[in-house]
Amino acid sequence: MKIMRKNHPLLKIVNHSFIDLPTPSNISSWWNFGSLLGICLMIQILTGLFLAMHYTSDTTTAFSSVAHICRDVNYGWLIRYLHANGASMFFICLFIHVGRGIYYGSYTLSETWNIGIILFLTTMATAFVGYVLPWGQMSFWGATVITNLLSAIPYIGSTLVEWIWGGFSVDKATLTRFFAFHFILPFIITALVLVHLLFLHETGSNNPSGLNSDSDKIPFHPYYTFKDLLGILLLLMALMILALFFPDILGDPDNYTPANPLNTPAHIKPEWYFLFAYAILRSIPNKLGGVLALILSILILATFPLLNTSKQHGLIYRPITQTIYWIFIANLLVLTWIGGQPVXYPFTMIGQIASITYFVIIIILMPISNTIENNIIKL
């Protein structure tokens, strides 16, 4: 009898993607984060769907509807905290996934890498519009400040901001459309994930050694399905600990105050996963310059395949670039810390130094270290 999974039109696709997929035999746990991101996306869509059943996207009732979910809906508090902290877990996995891609040279698979950048931007957009929905103080002022950045665009800026707001300030129209965006974007992300996987399976996975692994492949199932299962269990355990014991540790206390357009919070700041980009934005005194730096802080990832001149794949045998890479990671952590600090000396100065370092490492130091290492190989 023919094996159904190999011949059925639909199951055949699943089989080639998750069961009989030829995978390098030496990929480490750093390759687990792709599947963990898939699990995070599923958790977010499911919890989000149940939240959307009880949420109302109206300025007068949005805050109360979130309180109602936590108080009156069966396990509503759990669904809400799983969704809020699930976003944090999503971004932790996302940052590690991108960091692994840079370290092991996965950016040489340029189609997969570029779709990944689009996915990163779409996920950031989804998280931003989602943060506005509870309609607390930080939700309202975060939306006001970030959308207002578009007014820096010459000629059409002010009109564009009013068009996005649906009026002359962040109000009911803004909240309604942000809810619509927040509902549809995860499904767009899901479609992009399929394209991401399609491109990845065209070329095959990268591996820690950076060498061609065509001669040494093993089937994805059962080897990597069980390896991924361990990662998934650890992720779920971390998420449950976060949601049950420390549900508000990554949130902002100001968001437990209903939105008030007449009262500005002392320090307006986004969620922790945007702080690095927010620090880069704040470090430039000019509004348009800050917006451009903010956009470039993400889009600069697209330059990795272009600026890579190394004759070796990945950083595993390249100590100079390895050192620069870890300085880059430390610099990112400094930017994240600075983004959450008030705009005052010495934080502004540290932020400016860290922002310059961020771009200098990628555009100047990494290509130079590539050239040095290429010359060392020739010796």
UniProtKB/Swiss-Prot annotation:
It is found in: Mitochondrion inner membrane. The chain crosses the membrane at residues 33-53, 77-98, 113-133, 178-198, 226-246, 288-308, 320-340, 347-367. InterPro entries: Cyt_b/b6_C (IPR005798), Cyt_b/b6_C_sf (IPR036150), Cyt_b/b6_N (IPR005797), Cytb/b6-like_sf (IPR027387), Cytochrome_b (IPR030689), Cytochrome_b_C_euk/bac (IPR048260), Cytochrome_b_N_euk/bac (IPR048259), Di-haem_cyt_TM (IPR016174). GO terms for cellular component: mitochondrial inner membrane; respiratory chain complex III. Its main location: mitochondrion. One of its GO terms (molecular function) is ubiquinol-cytochrome-c reductase activity. Heme b b566 binds at H97, H196. Gene3D superfamilies: Cytochrome Bc1 Complex, Chain C. GO terms for biological process: mitochondrial electron transport, ubiquinol to cytochrome c. A ubiquinone binds at H201. Pfam families: Cytochrom_B_C (PF00032), Cytochrome_B (PF00033). It is a multi-pass membrane protein. Binds 2 heme b groups non-covalently. Its cofactor is heme b. CDD domains: cytochrome_b_C, Cytochrome_b_N. Component of the ubiquinol-cytochrome c reductase complex (complex III or cytochrome b-c1 complex) that is part of the mitochondrial respiratory chain. The b-c1 complex mediates electron transfer from ubiquinol to cytochrome c. Contributes to the generation of a proton gradient across the mitochondrial membrane that is then used for ATP synthesis. Belongs to the cytochrome b family. Heme 1 (or BL or b562) is low-potential and absorbs at about 562 nm, and heme 2 (or BH or b566) is high-potential and absorbs at about 566 nm. PANTHER family: CYTOCHROME B (PTHR19271:SF16). The cytochrome bc1 complex contains 11 subunits: 3 respiratory subunits (MT-CYB, CYC1 and UQCRFS1), 2 core proteins (UQCRC1 and UQCRC2) and 6 low-molecular weight proteins (UQCRH/QCR6, UQCRB/QCR7, UQCRQ/QCR8, UQCR10/QCR9, UQCR11/QCR10 and a cleavage product of UQCRFS1). This cytochrome bc1 complex then forms a dimer. This is Cytochrome b. The gene is MT-CYB.
